[in-house]
């Protein structure tokens, strides 16, 4: 086996320090929705599911997954959405109420520091920071190309009232900022009810089995 030598400068380039974090506060279609307008989105490895072409990405090399983070003050929510690939939350600090289901009423779990939560594909999920200060959820998304986001129907409708639209090729159109709605690419429409009805339901007990709390870990 051939040894792989990694120069110090390359190791330094691949080390993302806290001082290297660059937030995007308009990464998603709900960036003007009251209660969701103070989110910070970070893209450490890959662009994740950011819908903003100006999103800063620390490392663009393909890793087979995407790594990012959501930074949120107390009371701020990330609205209901689903992903095409698996997502893992790592609670980096804070208290988050995670909810799931198209209306967020299928179940809830309150996550604290150190939790690792693996979220199924094709399930609407959202979360709110209920801690006393800013919280950080690290997010790991499977595959190099994640496929984007499907937002809950109510999220898209409310965003439209603030001049925000999403194209079928995952571009955020901000008419307030002067963007023109394209004529050659259709806009994303809310998910049809017939497809929503086919989504798998998860009970609180089933979701708890997908949570690894600090006390659940066994070191060897």
Where are these regions (language model features)?
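Conserved metal-binding segment of the jelly-roll/cupin
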Residues: 73-75, 110-131, 138-142
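Short histidine-centered beta-strand/loop micro-motifs
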Residues: 55-61, 78-83, 100, 108-110, ...
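A short, N-terminal "cap"/entry segment at the start of jelly-roll beta-barrel domains
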Residues: 1-63, 170-220
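Conserved short histidine dyad/triad with adjacent acidic residue
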Residues: 46-56, 66-83
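His/acidic/aromatic-lined binding-pocket segments of jelly-roll/cupin-type domains
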Residues: 69-70, 80-82, 86-91, 109, ...
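Short acidic-glycine-tyrosine-enriched beta hairpin
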Residues: 62-63, 86, 102-120
């Amino acid at each position: 086996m051939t040894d792989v030598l990694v120069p110090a400068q390359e190791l330094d380039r691949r080390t993302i320090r806290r001082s290297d974090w660059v937030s995007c506060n308009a990464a998603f279609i709900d960036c003007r929705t009251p209660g969701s307008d103070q989110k910070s989105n970070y893209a450490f490895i890959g662009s994740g599911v950011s819908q903003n072409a100006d999103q800063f990405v620390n490392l663009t090399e393909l890793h087979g997954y995407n790594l990012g983070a959501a930074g949120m003050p107390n009371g701020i929510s990330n609205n209901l959405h689903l992903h095409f690939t698996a997502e893992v939350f790592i609670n980096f600090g804070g208290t988050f109420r995670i909810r799931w289901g198209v209306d967020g009423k299928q179940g809830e779990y309150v996550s604290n520091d150190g939790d690792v939560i693996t979220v199924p594909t094709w399930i609407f999920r959202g979360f709110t920071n209920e801690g006393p200060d800013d919280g950080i959820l690290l997010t790991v998304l499977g595959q190099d190309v994640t496929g984007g986001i499907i937002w809950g129907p109510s999220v898209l409708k409310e965003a439209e009232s603030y001049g925000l639209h999403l194209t079928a090729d995952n571009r955020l159109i901000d008419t307030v900022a002067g963007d023109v709605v394209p004529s050659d690419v259709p806009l994303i429409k809310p998910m049809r009810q017939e497809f929503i009805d086919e989504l798998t339901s998860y009970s609180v007990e089933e979701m708890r089995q997908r949570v690894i709390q600090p006390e659940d870990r066994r070191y060897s």
